[in-house]
Amino acid sequence: MMEFQEMFSKYQTQYRQLMKSGQHKDAVVPLTTLVSLLDTTTIHQVSPIPEAAIREQKALLLYDLACCYALLGHKRQALLALEHSVEDGYKDYNNMANDNDLRSLRKDKKYQSLLAQVQGRQPIHVLRHSAPYARDAERLNDGKPLFIYQPKESMNLRVVREYFNLDSVAGTGDELSRIINLLHFAHDKIRHDGGNRAFVEMDAIDIYNYCKATGKGVNCRQLALSLCEMYLSLGIPARYVTCMPADPNDYECHVIDAVWSSELQKWLYIDPTMDAWVTDENGTMLSIAEVRERLINDKPLLLCETANWNHETPQTKENYLDNYMSKNLYYFVCKRVNRFNAESMYRDYDPRDDIQLVPVGYVSESQHCEATTDPDVFWAKP
């Protein structure tokens, strides 16, 4: 694996420097070498790198190769490389449509056909063409709650509450202000790093202390799990929700929190990674289900002004909701039991612990996980 990484890094650095300096003819050699390297590698069989990630990287390299050929005036080779890029899943429509490196191809019918394929992969397009939900009469009539919420009086949640002094953090204001204060607290205290999964116990205290001791961040799952425990410790029902894309080869998802508001009588969309919540045009906070529905039907959505990544990058509605979250709101997964340390490293994972909300006809990779097509069942009042 080390040899592969060193070779890949070497040729990647070469071609990027050559492209940056306008030496597109010379950049073709390291680019084709990289494509060949990914074509023949079996590294996904002996490392945590998913095969889908290799294919995605190959699509990006082929796209850059197409740009080089187009700038050199080699139209046939450019279109062939672009076709292979699209076959391997290239999906950045805005980049492809506006990239001046490809301007010599724009009137070509083959280019236009490839661009149309990429447009169909845009997250908002996929979401708007998803199948509808359907009533799940069996579970509705069952009467048993799908989800359980650990009471705040439990010893572990009491420890969380006292450790972080959460009564003081939440404040004495109304319910919504308390929910938002806890969001800000988690966002400020636990840094995000999407590429790092801290190998600690999966509870708010251990995760916080890991960040404090190492100066490192944690992934969105560990952040959302931590904030979920904080809400539960104050008696506010909450779940951390894995928001999933439609594409089974897309290994990137996002995890946020659904927090119950007794005042609004609904689950609220709360994202500790981005310090974010979403409102309608009247300023009313929305649920995850409402955000999804409004994206599908192109209704107004307002992202809170505080939305940011690690206090470094402000978030916009267009980038965060229209692009990123529209990809990750295709289906949802929640834990059946919402509690302290819900994913302990010392417990074996059991797919029966999870419940999914999926569109009609969609079958996810986790076929052993219980699923429903009924949002009323999945988002039932706690």
Predicted features along the sequence, with ranges:
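Flexible helix-coil transition and linker loops at the boundaries of alpha-helical arrays
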Residues: 1-2, 37-55
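"A position-specific structural signal for the A-helix of alpha-solenoid helical repeats
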Residues: 13, 64, 98-101
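Secondary-structure boundary elements
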Residues: 130-218
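Hydrophobic/aromatic-rich core segments of domains that either
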Residues: 225-299
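Low-complexity, Gly/Ser/Thr/Pro-rich intrinsically disordered linker/tail segments
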Residues: 296-382
